Amino acid sequence: MCDLIGVDTLAIMIIWLNGTFGAGKTTTAKELVRLIPKARIFDPEEVGFMLRHVPGLPEVSDFQDWRPWRGLVVETASQLLDYVGGVLVVPQTVLVEQYWAEIHSGLEKAGIPVHHFLLHTDQDTLVHRIETDTVETGARQWRLDHVPDYHTALSWLSREAEIIDTTGTPPAQVARAVAAGVEARSAGGQ
């Protein structure tokens, strides 16, 4: 681990890594926790997996469609930061603008600064990454099916997040670009 110059390592914050499936969020998150002291990964997918076991919830194709998922993501992040402090790195795709607004405003109300980054890659690289992923091979078709949703969401995502192009960029370099963005935003009071 190394300290980021200019980042208050005592402050709490969230670094939210958005982007379509295959953009490099999880890999970048792992690199970021090596760069930033007191950083840990919080994966909101786990909240969704928990909710799948609750009887009576309506059937949905994506657990983000459950309002409790969005509220629990905010509450869990808030509780974690209250308990352990530091920085939460959140590698989570959110493609519905209303859902992002709910999560972001909830975190804002809790007094948690959010640094939102969109990891973007070109179409060929994206499809190659999805098709050659050996970790979650069962999710391959689901990820490919959601690429059009990502392209639809790009207009609002590009307004809401700082875009980092991951095409042909090694994960460690992407993580350094995100860390530099956090450092610049923190220094600028954003």
Show the residue positions of the predicted features.
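N-terminal amphipathic/basic-hydrophobic helices that include classical n-h-c signal peptides
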Residues: 1-12
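Small-molecule kinase domains that catalyze NTP-dependent phosphoryl transfer to phosphate-bearing small molecules
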Residues: 132-177, 185, 189
